[in-house]
């Protein structure tokens, strides 16, 4: 076993020790480690340690950049062996996915160079890599007209840009805040690389962390260079 990653085992054991207490008292953690030390996988292990094995593990990873979202999804598929019925990767459009594929094949940062992080899309234009579904019931019937929102809510592990969860803290026309709110209500939250955001984004980040905590989510911040201001 690589010595560089042994800290993950320590983090898992330390978190597991108070997983029961976190169900009632909540959890707010910070995972700080240098780039290349395995924070992405450690985040998943920490959230798994907090979860109840009988109920299963459900968590959302929110990032600031779409290219990092795709890379995180790839890491979870490859290293955690998560299938398409367990992991949902939510990005802006098929175009971003194709750019990411070019990046993997050609080892170039094509998606970032084209500024795909700034694309604004509605849920109708999202590409969701996920094949699971909600069991029959009222929620499934309510979401039947929007399959992509159903995927957003139902996936055990969700990796997405944070803008897809942010409507949970805002009043949206047509009830568009309901699906992100349901996601936070039924899963824990990982904010990955929050330092990618500017200071002007801090109020929005604080709102989603506060709202997630009020809904019962356990929250983890993960970063290699988290500034004191955050």
Sequence positions of predicted segments:
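N-terminal helicase ATP-binding lobe
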Residues: 1-230
């Amino acid at each position: 076993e690589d010595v560089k990653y042994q800290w993950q085992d320590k983090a898992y054991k330390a978190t597991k020790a108070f997983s029961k207490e976190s169900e009632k008292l909540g959890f707010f953690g910070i995972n700080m480690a240098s780039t290349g030390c395995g924070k992405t996988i450690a985040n998943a292990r920490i959230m798994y340690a907090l979860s109840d094995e009988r109920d299963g593990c459900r968590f959302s990873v929110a990032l600031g950049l779409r290219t990092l979202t795709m890379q995180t999804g790839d890491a979870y598929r490859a290293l955690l062996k998560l299938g398409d019925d367990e992991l949902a990767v939510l990005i802006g459009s098929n175009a971003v996915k194709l750019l990411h594929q070019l990046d993997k094949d050609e080892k170039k940062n094509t998606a970032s160079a084209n500024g795909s992080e700034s694309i604004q899309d509605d849920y109708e234009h999202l590409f969701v890599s996920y094949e699971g579904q909600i069991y029959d019931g009222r929620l499934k019937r309510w979401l039947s007209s929007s399959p992509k929102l159903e995927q957003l809510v139902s996936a055990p592990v969700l990796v997405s840009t944070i803008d897809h969860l942010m409507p949970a803290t805002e009043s949206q026309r047509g009830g568009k805040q309901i699906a992100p709110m349901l996601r936070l209500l039924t899963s824990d939250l990982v904010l990955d690389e929050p330092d990618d955001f500017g200071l002007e984004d801090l109020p929005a980040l604080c709102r989603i962390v506060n709202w997630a905590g009020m809904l019962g989510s356990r929250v983890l911040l993960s970063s290699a260079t988290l500034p004191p201001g955050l």
